């Protein structure tokens, strides 16, 4: 393992959830204690997720139900990042959404104008309420020059027993195949996710540590932003995937329970 100094010096931990802290409704052993360890050792934490099917408020409710401490300032989603991006770059432009009602509420809370006709922007998310009409309309707007923005590039969302759900990246692949338009992805691995949080908290990127189970999102965003990275082997990545990947984490640990032990000053096992 690499020297632990940079890990121990990290002041803010950006935490993936699915595959890192829990899978479905199954909380990984030691995951809640890990959050308490961060707080007890004076470290900040933010639950950082690419899952745009839920609003930030939904995550607060879900995390608390699963036993995790969580306040509003502890959650940042790709949906929230997308809303900020739209307001910064396309303020007032009419948007057609391929997304859940929760994502719709999130965008509306940021003042994003959502329309069914005359859209200049198509926004896609992880739409667990997807119907064919949404795809039809999105392709219609894209083929007529609408800008394509997507919340996250994940192909699938992991589920218990090795199952997966088609995620935003898969939906976007369909839309791109039909329209010929490639999306701009806002969530991880876009460094914007880390940069926005750094600006809001005052913690420099080099003292931020991204923790997750996916190389192409959780670890890649850290690499792109110049942050520290911890890959946990509790989710999607196995040894073969890690060895074959061009994206490499600074630290590889079994799970967040092992990370908690290190942060408490113990010896990694």
How does the language model describe each region?
Residues 51:
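Conserved phosphate/oxyanion-binding catalytic-loop motifs
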Residues 1-15, 22-43, 54-76, 83-269:
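Asp-based, Mg2+/Mn2+-dependent phosphohydrolase catalytic module
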Residues 46-48:
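Domain-scale selection of a single, long terminal region
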């Amino acid at each position: 393992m690499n020297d632990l100094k940079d890990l121990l010096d990290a002041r803010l931990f950006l935490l993936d959830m699915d595959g890192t802290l829990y899978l479905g409704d199954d909380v990984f052993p030691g995951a809640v204690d890990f959050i308490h360890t961060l707080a007890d050792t004076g470290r900040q934490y933010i639950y950082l997720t690419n899952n745009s099917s839920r609003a930030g408020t939904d995550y607060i409710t879900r995390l608390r139900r699963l036993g995790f401490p969580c306040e509003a300032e502890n959650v940042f989603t790709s949906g929230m990042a997308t809303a900020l991006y739209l307001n910064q770059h396309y303020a007032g432009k009419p948007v057609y959404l391929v997304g859940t009602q929760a994502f719709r509420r999130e965008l509306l809370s940021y003042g994003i104008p959502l329309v069914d006709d005359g859209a200049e922007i198509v926004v896609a998310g992880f739409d667990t309420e997807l119907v064919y009409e949404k795809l039809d309309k999105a392709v219609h707007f894209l083929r007529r020059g609408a800008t394509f923005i997507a919340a996250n590039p994940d192909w699938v969302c992991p589920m218990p027993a090795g199952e997966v759900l088609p995620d935003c990246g898969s939906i976007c692949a369909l839309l791109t195949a039909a329209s010929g338009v490639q999306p701009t992805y806002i969530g991880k691995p876009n460094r914007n996710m880390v940069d926005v949080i750094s600006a809001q908290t005052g913690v420099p990127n080099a003292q931020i540590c991204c923790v997750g189970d996916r190389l192409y999102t959780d670890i890649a965003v850290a690499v792109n932003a110049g942050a520290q990275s911890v890959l946990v082997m509790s989710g999607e990545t196995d040894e073969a995937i890690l060895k074959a990947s061009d994206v490499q984490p600074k630290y590889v640990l079994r799970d967040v329970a092992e990370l908690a032990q290190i942060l408490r000053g113990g010896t990694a096992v």
